[in-house]
Amino acid sequence: MRARLMLTSAALLLTAAGPSWQQRALSSAAPSTDKANHEWARAIVSGDPDVLSAPYEEHGIFIGPDGSVSVGKAAVRAIYASRPASVRVLKADIRSDGRAAPDPDDVYEWGTAEITVQRGAAIKEASGRYLTVWHHNGARWVITRNIAF
């Protein structure tokens, strides 16, 4: 009886000490999410639609702050490629405020993006929240849903 109790206690201790599947999913997704955020801040300034759409899954969905919906990586690329030449992004930053793993292959990320835009002589600073669903697709983590508020 005592041996069984010790064995059960040891099993519980080892289970608690090991990383949970949630932590494994978050750790696995982190390099992709961090890279995409870093590249977004640079590419939104330079206006590079290929870099901006790169993390999206082929049928990923982007919902803009105005409620517009773009379905597919090509449509997301087209949004970024359509920025008028008269609009310049002077500065951009993105901050991930949190991440959660609802299952081993999905990670929800939320945060804040800040941007400084020049239209003609007018310069405007804005910030907005975002919620992104990342999905583990084979060897990659890709965006399947992205909502900009």
Mark where each language-model region is.
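Bacterial N-terminal signal peptides that target proteins for export
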Residues: M1-L7
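Short, low-complexity N-terminal intrinsically disordered segments enriched in polar/charged residues
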Residues: R4, L13-E58
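Short beta-strand edge/turn micro-motifs at domain boundaries
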Residues: W21, S127-F149
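Hydrophobic pocket/interface hotspot
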Residues: W40, L52-S53, G60, G72, ...
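A mature extracytoplasmic/lumenal domain signature
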Residues: Y56, D66, G111-A113, I147
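Short solvent-exposed beta->alpha transition segments
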Residues: Y56-R88
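Solvent-exposed strand-loop boundary residues in beta-sheet-rich modules
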Residues: D66, R119-A121, G138
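Surface-exposed, charged secondary-structure patches
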Residues: R77-I123
